[in-house]
């Protein structure tokens, strides 16, 4: 636990023992799984110094906090290896339980699975006046619920294949147990799963009392015997152990049996991509041993907690609908996989809006909105549960259902820094089930392109997985895959002819990716410099119409061949745009590059000159990146 106004968080590799042997993990501040709980006070200005000691990029998102988009820690606020990110912000949220976790696009599941994350507790004057348990770790206990799958003692995180763990981890511990005093105790519970949902209850079916949702206290304690908690959601409950005997025990349970298909973790399989030994099964989350009460025990559940003033639907000036679509191979919103570079949703600063999220798919999702807390207005699958009538930032969206909520977008505006909305199942968000929006003082003044999109290309970087770097390096000396395709002018391009006496440079293009547009001028520069001594050929993941649209916008100085069936792309192992393959005369791959920067462009130039038997041309790569940049996924 860390308190204060300045918080230093260092993310690094670590290890611990879960089963037999040592398991590699990630942790903050030398912890081996999860990070320290941060205690913040409403109204104070805090500084977060996030140092990245991994060998890969990361981000840290302050989940549930209301703060400027530039300090939100989403996919755009990347912390490179060895660097420190130090955002400062005023704590505006109500007292409650929030959390922090990585949000690096396409790498969230990996980093979260390995243990990167932690809790945030915010205190405020209203909560401080209440007679509630708040001695951290004694009668006020945080619980982070998740599960993991292991192979040869190592945590696995391969997308859908590892979305459900076989081993329950509570606070990073197998078969967790604790001692709690014989009195009223407070449990702050976070579902930090990859995908699994939990139906919470106690082994003796006792009543417990919910006192807070995602965004803080509810008006009055809500008596419950069961509570469904989806990925990213938090709840605070009071459990009365006053009638228990010292030495007695009770278990916090996941009552997940008899779920229908579509409930995350409701699949009946015990193995495979959708299977787990914990699926559709009731099991223990925490074994509680009752011990003697503390000297200042809280023994009575308060009758009232606060008086929330919710935003009224009548104040709404706009209504929006978002639909969950696809699922083959990845889920998306409105049929559009996430593009970090653009958004087409602009919200006016201070506006109250009503959003409806429709799930037209066969599977349930966990919807999370950055920036603000909201109030759920309606559901089509059932009545709004008592336990979700408070402030929310995350909710369960079952298959075939719609959820409508109202939110006010106040305080923070930026025409260049977006907020996110996404499925909080990290395998889904990594697969592209995300969108983003801008809060603007003057939406009409925000510049859009011909398609009505707002461009964030300058802020975008993609993680380059180590496996792709290794696979790319392995391409060298392999025979180049043959192809014969027509370019946009109708010319037939046959590799055997192109590479008969001179080198060929293949440049792989994602049709909507600004990375491709940014890199194309450098390849045009290369072609112009060496003229007939080499052939630069663009390969784009589009049909002829899409390829011509791209070429009209970019005006490349080299021919482009459409590859809508990915035949050439797959044959060369290209996973992302701006992938470059250099082919020697005769048809052997000289080298492949998973991304580009000034150094790689200079190396390609020198290689082309050497292979072509011509003098090397000294080129100036104006504004080329200094670090190796990969592009958007080609699929």
Language model feature labels by segment:
Residues 312, 318-376, 393-418, 422:
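C-terminal substrate/ligand-recognition segments
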Residues 495-517:
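Short active-site neighborhood of thiol/selenol oxidoreductases, capturing the structured segment around
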Residues 1-240, 258-260, 270-308, 315-325, ...:
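Histidine-centered copper-binding motifs that mark active-site loops
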Residues 464-496:
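N-terminal "domain-start" segment that seeds a small globular fold
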Residues 90-96, 240-246, 408-416:
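Short, surface-exposed loop/turn segments at beta-strand-coil junctions that are enriched for proline
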Residues 585-635:
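Thiol-/selenol-based redox modules, centered on thioredoxin-like
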Residues 552-556, 566-607:
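Thiol/disulfide oxidoreductase modules built on the thioredoxin-like
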Residues 517-554, 565-570:
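Structural microenvironment flanking redox-active thiols in thiol-disulfide oxidoreductases
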